């Protein structure tokens, strides 16, 4: 089976998101003949150029499936394969918190254009109003291996006597709501609690921070299935998160995890306070295994859909 993997390459020239790369590699390990196609640049000109390149690649390789990540890449994949029999599968990675034009056209493509569509959370499927397979992104447990808490703190340069709340994204990304994280931590009024943003780090270093942190905080306004929550759980790190995507299902009421309404800084600070009082590691890694959210378990689910097309 030949599959072309299409995804945004705007992280850097020719570089896709870490979770896309991880899924690509896990499908290769399942025996799928994979080709990665990054879409570089922004705007219609970039996608027009990508359409020419993708169409040429499809004609040269004759793949069985073009699997696109994100709805816009799904439109690109459909346009590039419209004159042949290649199947198009799309992973919808975000969510639709309110009715919009985008919601309407995504529904149209799911029903009339794409051959298969998967979403990352049941919430997204409910927002679309369509019965769709829900397959969240997985975590590579070999990559996110456990590191001793005290060893990790030393490697990260964390100060003795301080509690660290890590927040894993670039503060400039408005949808991630870093100011809300700042406000919640400020409400604790404790100089020994440090809000520590982690960004532009390789996975090998992110693992260290998650194993060293006292709490992982997520304050996004919307997500599909945030990988950072699953990665933190794989490191047995306590989690405080806004109620986005599938976090309620993933955390499942596990001791050491708190899900609070979006935008409520008081509720966030209380949850952070509770997490710090919890004061130990969670059983998050065990729950990831139970839910079937390792990269290989997820790859097997995706391959099963490939086999039906």
Where are these regions (language model features)?
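Conserved acidic donor-binding segment of nucleotide-sugar-dependent glycosyltransferases
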Residues: 253-265, 273-279
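Conserved donor-binding/catalytic core segment of Leloir-type glycosyltransferases
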Residues: 158-176, 182-185
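Short His-centered aromatic/hydrophobic patch
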Residues: 68-74, 92
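Aromatic "clamp/platform" in nucleotide-sugar-dependent glycosyltransferases that forms part
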Residues: 221
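Acidic anion/phosphate-binding donor-loop and adjacent secondary structure
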Residues: 139-155, 309
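A charged, aromatic-enriched C-terminal amphipathic alpha-helix characteristic of glycosyltransferases
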Residues: 279-308
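Short hydrophobic beta-strand element within catalytic cores of glycosyltransferases
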Residues: 238-241
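Short alpha-helical donor nucleotide-sugar binding micro-motif in glycosyltransferases
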Residues: 208-213
């Amino acid at each position: 089976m030949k599959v072309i993997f299409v995804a945004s390459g705007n992280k850097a020239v020719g570089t896709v998101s870490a979770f896309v790369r991880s899924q690509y590699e896990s499908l290769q390990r399942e025996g799928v003949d994979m080709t990665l196609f990054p879409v570089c640049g922004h705007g219609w000109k970039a996608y027009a150029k990508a359409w020419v390149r993708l169409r040429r690649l499809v004609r040269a390789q004759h793949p069985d499936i073009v699997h696109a990540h994100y709805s816009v890449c799904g439109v690109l994949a459909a346009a590039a394969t419209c004159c042949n029999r290649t199947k198009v599968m799309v992973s919808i990675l975000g969510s639709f918190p309110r009715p919009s034009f985008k919601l309407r056209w995504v529904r149209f493509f799911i029903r009339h254009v794409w051959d298969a569509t998967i979403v990352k959370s049941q919430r997204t499927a409910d927002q679309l109003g369509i019965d769709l397979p829900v397959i969240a992104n997985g975590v590579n447990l070999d990559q996110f291996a456990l590191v001793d808490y005290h060893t990790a703190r030393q490697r990260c340069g964390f100060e003795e006597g301080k509690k660290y709340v890590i927040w894993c994204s670039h503060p400039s990304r408005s949808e991630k709501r870093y100011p809300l994280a700042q406000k919640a931590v400020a409400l604790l009024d404790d100089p020994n609690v440090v809000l520590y943003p982690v960004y532009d780090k390789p996975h090998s270093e992110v693992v260290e921070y998650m194993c060293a942190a006292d709490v992982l905080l997520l304050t996004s306004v919307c997500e599909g299935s945030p990988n950072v929550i699953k990665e933190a759980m794989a490191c047995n790190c306590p989690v405080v998160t806004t109620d986005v995507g599938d976090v309620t299902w993933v955390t499942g009421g596990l001791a050491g995890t708190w899900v609070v309404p979006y935008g409520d800084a008081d509720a966030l600070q209380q949850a952070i306070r509770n997490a710090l009082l919890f004061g130990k590691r969670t059983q998050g890694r065990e729950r990831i295994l139970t839910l079937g959210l390792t990269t290989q378990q997820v790859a097997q689910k995706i391959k099963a859909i490939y086999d039906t097309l």
